[in-house]
Amino acid sequence: MAEVRARVDFKVGAKSNIDAEILSFRGLKTDKEHVAVIFKSADVTQEVPLVRMHSECLTGDVFHSSRCDCGEQLEETINRMGESGGIILYLRQEGRGIGLYNKIDAYRLQSEGMNTYEANNHLGFDDDLRDFTEAAQMLEALGIKQIRLVTNNPKKIRELSEYGIEIVEVVNTSAHIKEGNESYLKAKVSHGKHHLKV
């Protein structure tokens, strides 16, 4: 059974001015070092906390890549939760689970005209290899059974529900369209059935 390993205060956001806590876990399904970032002690102060499962994206989260909207979604969520409280489950699932180097290979194929899903398939991967079991385990370790989920992705909604987490409300993120990511976002809508207006 998963449990909280450590819980430490820190400040986050573009200006490091938003109070939060970072939590590590033990007993998760794999040895991936997933973390939770909690704002305003939402795990104890909110009966049904706002939760976002955010899969690691080095290129978007750290380098603000033009190819995706991951960094903007993360920043939007941090700012929202900094004001109203909530929990980010930061999952080490780079490239929808294919890993960083394979994602870079997929970028090369996208530059040649494939969309994000076609590129993954061409490399021998399914559309999305992520498994959200550990996100459910993290919520269980925090004693959370009901959430308001911040997502545009129906797979996240479906899988968390299958793992016994009751999703009381779905809160969509904004569409963060910029030069270089419009075809990526359109593929997420047409192929991945994401709830986005692009």
Swiss-Prot record:
Pathway: Cofactor biosynthesis; riboflavin biosynthesis; 5-amino-6-(D-ribitylamino)uracil from GTP: step 1/4
Gene Ontology biological process terms, A to Z: riboflavin biosynthetic process
Alphabetized UniProt keyword annotations: GTP-binding, Hydrolase, Metal-binding, Nucleotide-binding, Riboflavin biosynthesis, Zinc
Segments forming a coiled coil: none
Record: residues binding GTP: R52, M53, H54, S55, E56, Q73, E94, G95, R96, T116, T151, K156
Cofactor(s) the protein needs: Zn(2+)
Active site: D128, R130
An MF annotation (GO) of this entry: GTP cyclohydrolase II activity
NCBIfam families (alphabetical): PRK00393.1, ribA
HAMAP family: RibA
Name of this chain's protein: GTP cyclohydrolase-2
Top-level taxonomy: Bacteria, Pseudomonadati, Pseudomonadota, Gammaproteobacteria, Vibrionales
